[in-house]
Structures are given as C-alpha cells and as structure tokens.
Amino acid sequence: MPDKFSDHIAEPSVVHVTTRAERRRAFGILFVSLLCMGAGQTVLFNILPPLSRQLHLSAVQTTSVFAVSAAIWVVTATYWGKKSDHWGRKPVMLLGLLSFAASFALFASVMLAGLHNWLPAVAIFPLMIVTRSLYGALGSGTQPASQAYVADRTTPQERLQGVATIGSAFGLGTVAGPAIASLFTPFGLLAPFYFISGLALASAATIWFLLPERTPPRARAPASVSLKWHDRRVLPFALFAVGLSTASTVPIQTMGFFFMDVLHVRPEHAAQYNMIGQLATSLAALFAQLVVVQYARLSSRTMTNLGLGTAFLSCAAFLLFGNFLVLVVGLALSGLGFGLARPGFTTGASLSVAPHEQGAVAGVIGGASAMGFIAGPLIGWMYEWSPYVPYGFAAVLLAGLFVFQWLSPALRNAGIIPPDIEIVEEDLETPVANA
C-alpha cells in the first residue's frame, strides 16, 4: 500500500461476506427494525407537544426530555458499538430494540398516568425523563451494531450502498410515523406508542430467529484493541459528524416557527405547513439514499461534497426568499443534501479502520451525530435574535465543513480502497456464530 495513505486507511485484510441472497434477507430484517425506530421518533415529535400542554409541561421541559436522552446517547453509542465488536452484533441489536420497546411503552404509560391523575403531577416530568433516558442509555446500540453488521458483510466497494440502505430505513420510518399516528390515534392518543412498542418486540424476535451472524465475535475483536474517539483515524470524522448533525437540526427545529414568524402563518395552520415541510425533507432524503447513492456509484468523498453543496443551497433559500413554495424546495434540498452527506462520510469512517473495529467506529460516529440535538437550546437562542440567524449559522458551518474536509488528510483520502483486499464469500454451510 502506498505510504501516503497508510495513516488513513485500514490495513489490507481478507474480507468475508455472506452470500447475496442472505445479505438481502438480513438487510431486509435490519431495514424493518430501524424503520420501526424512525417511526417512533416522529410519532413522539408529533404527539408529545399537544400532550405536554395537557400535562401542563413547559416548552423547556418538553425539549429537555429529548436533550437529556440525546446527551446520554452521545456517551453510550460508542460504548455499545465497541461491545458489538466483542459480543457480536445480534446481542447488541436485541438489547437496543428491547430497550426501545420498553422505553416507548413505559413513556406512554407515564403520560397515561399523568392524564388520569394516577400519579402525583410532580412525578410525571421526572418519570418522563427516566423512561426516555432508558432509550438513550440502552437503545443507542442498535444503529451502530446494525451499521457494523453491514460493514461485516459488504465489500469495501459495496459499503456506501449498504450503509445508505440501512440509513434510509430510519428515514422511511420518519415518513411512516405520521401515518401510524393518524391510523391509531382514533383508538387513543397514546395508542401509536403501544403499537410501535409491539412492532419493536416483533422485530427483535425476527432478529433472534432469522438474522444470520457467522463471524465469531472473539475472532472479530481482539481484547487488547479498543478504538478511542480521539484516534487520529476517527477524530476528523467525529468532528465532521458533530458539525453536520448540528447544521441538519436547524431546519428540523425552526421551520415551524419560521413559517409563523416570517410567512405569518396562523398558529392553528402551522402544523399543516410543518408537516408538508417535513414530508418534503424526508422524501428527498429517501431519494438520496435509495436512488442516488444506490445507482450513481459515486465515491464516498464525492457524495459528501455533493451533499454539503446541496444543503448549503437549502440554507440560501431560507435566507433569500420568503415564499412557502420556495421554502419547501429548500427543505427538499436540505433532505437531499444531508441524505447524501451522511452515508458519504459514514462510509469513509468505516473504511478508515480495520474490520474488527467496525462496531467501535459506528458507535463513535453515532454518538457524535447525536450532538446536534443537544445544540437545540443554542439554535433556539439564535432564533430569538432573528429567524434568519440559525440558517446563516448553518450555512457558515457547512462551508467550514467543506474546507475542513479538504484540509484533513483523513477526510480527503476517505473512501480510497486498498487494491490488495481479498474478498471471500461465505457459503451456506458456514457455521453460524452463536448470538
């Protein structure tokens, strides 16, 4: 391998991948599981605000529920990613899904108790924090373990498409979430929570019985090796993830207020405008991950640069125009841009480390990506100055990330595949490792 790339690319090795038929089945199972978690997020975002008013919770308390869980996620995602290197992917996925199911059901039960005065009012908010934090503490392992599972079973050349497919599952879930909420709320405002909790349990059972895992965990992860977030191969990608996730939260957290304050949409109609904007963002992100990434066959670095430029244009739409249709196009550009950039740099991070470090690097990137949600209060403070300030901040941040990518050798060389990697496809008789 050329010396100039030796610091940035994992050492050449033999890559074992499952057969194409088994990969399709396995990735389909993971897709449904992550779709379930994505749907849960949007159900929570859509139902919690009106419920919080009935529970007499302030806006600060409501946003704190998300912020505390996200802060815990930042720490624990790295931990569970490393554990998946030692325990295997399936145990960590199962723990995450079961914790998500328990957290979602318990969170709904606390709100139900509050609505019916079964618990003292003073206990509701702390219990909401605790039950939601269960997801942040234990549920954060599902995504990095799933991404590492994909890395275990794809060649370096296929990695970008595999990572994008798994990432699109969560995005499709965010589109399905409002539909699930509309379908089940006639049975009660909290019915969607219990439905998604049951769906998560069914997904966990499917993973337990049907998901193959052939690589023995101990062979995958030497006990003496522990990837750190400040490892020079990983740190640039982690910093990039923090910046990208922070920029991506700006439209998510402010577009509803922007419609009311800049377009003068009445509050009773703002939810409809917001739903149209969210749908445009989600569908564009899905198009990026399921069509552009899968069929354009661009390198991870090119995909990241294209995503940064497209997301920058979305910020310009908010800064320069005050027309709803133009802003919807801007939100679609936001979804398209971040939908391209995320799998691009995530794949670069995966290819920068060795096979036995895939869980650890997925955890580091997953934790760093959650940092953007912790920045919510900062974005809100900027919005108080002017509705345009957060979008100017996001534009500057995206431009800075573009420059950073060219200045950092690790990011600049991301996605370069060593020519001497040997690909070995497992056959159907290969023993399945115990989960």
What are these language model-derived features?
Residues 98-121, 310-322:
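C-terminal ends and interior cores of transmembrane alpha-helices
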Residues 46-61, 253-273:
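Short amphipathic helix-loop junctions that connect adjacent transmembrane helices
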Residues 129-170:
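Cytoplasmic helix-loop-helix junction between adjacent transmembrane helices
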Residues 35, 116-141, 326-340:
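Hydrophobic core of transmembrane alpha-helices in multi-pass small-molecule transporters
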Residues 71-75, 273-296:
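Transmembrane alpha-helices of Major Facilitator/SLC transporters
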Residues 7-24, 212-239, 423-435:
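Juxtamembrane intracellular "pre-TM" segments in multi-pass secondary transporters
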Residues 300-345:
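C-terminal transmembrane helical hairpin of 12-TM major facilitator-type secondary transporters
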Residues 76-89, 287-300, 383:
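Helix-to-loop junctions at the C-terminal end of transmembrane segments
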